[in-house]
Curated annotation (Swiss-Prot):
It comes from the Bacteria. A motif (CXXXC) lies at residues 5-9. This is Putative oxidative stress regulator AosR. Belongs to the AosR family. InterPro entries: AosR (IPR018561). The lineage of its organism: Bacteria, Bacillati, Actinomycetota, Actinomycetes, Mycobacteriales. The keyword Hydrolase does not apply. Pfam families: DUF2017. It comes from Mycobacterium leprae (strain TN). Keywords: Disulfide bond, Redox-active center, Stress response, Transcription, Transcription regulation. Disulfide bonds join 5-9.
Length: 217
């Protein structure tokens, strides 16, 4: 993850990541029912997260609905995934191939066909479970967003769901921004995607602080 390098508020020490937004650290609190992770989000941050997660869920639902109906699924109830690679670049980032050989550029057509067949079989078998996990994490993030006072309190399970969902949001934004590892720390002033990049950095630090809170003892 890129380092926390945003402008700090002199009064609170919070890190500003995009116009009107501050990343506030998470506080770990031990309770009789296990650890809780507390923070505060502003109303416009809640609205932003709802918008981003809604778009993510739309993509995942669209992918699931593209799976062909399988006779065995009707009989067994076991879902089969779409065997084809997603055409949408964002979905390709979220649901990459299961196997990519290091020497793929040097393989002959027959070997490439074998790799494609393997990935198709793995997608059909495992993609439904992956989509369900991503959707569940995204829905948990939505369900735990505050409605009024901005105060967040997450269980350990919810915190892990937030980390997974925020990571998927970063992957999706990374496609728009054409970000490859490692991500740049800034884009030129006036760049048409500068606001998207600021949101990407905000999500990165939000995720980083929550990971640190989970790792704290």
């Amino acid at each position: 993850m890129p380092p926390v390098c945003g402008r700090r508020c002199s009064r609170t020490g919070e890190v500003r990541r995009y116009p009107g937004s501050f990343v506030r650290k998470w506080k770990r609190v031990e309770t009789a029912n296990g650890p809780r992770f507390r923070s505060v989000v502003a109303p416009h941050e809640v609205a932003l997260l709802k918008h981003l997660v809604g778009a993510l869920l739309g993509l995942l639902n669209e992918r699931e609905s593209s799976s062909p109906l399988d006779e065995l699924e009707v009989i067994t109830g076991i879902k089969a995934g779409n065997a084809q690679r997603p055409e949408d670049p964002t979905l390709r980032r979220l649901l990459p191939d299961f196997y990519t050989p290091d020497d793929k550029d040097q393989l002959d057509p027959a070997a490439l066909d074998a790799v494609d067949s393997l990935n198709a079989a793995l997608r059909s078998l495992h993609e439904p479970e992956i989509v369900d996990a991503k959707r569940s994490a995204a829905q948990q993030l939505l369900d735990t967003l505050p409605e009024s006072d901005g105060r967040l309190e997450l269980t350990e399970a919810s915190a892990n769901a937030w980390i997974a969902a925020v990571n998927d949001l970063r992957l999706a934004l990374g496609v728009i921004l054409e970000i490859d590892r490692p991500a740049p720390e800034r884009v030129p002033a006036g760049h048409p995607l500068s606001v998207h990049f600021d949101v990407y950095q905000w999500l990165t630090v939000l995720q980083e602080y929550l990971v640190l809170a989970l790792m704290a003892t």
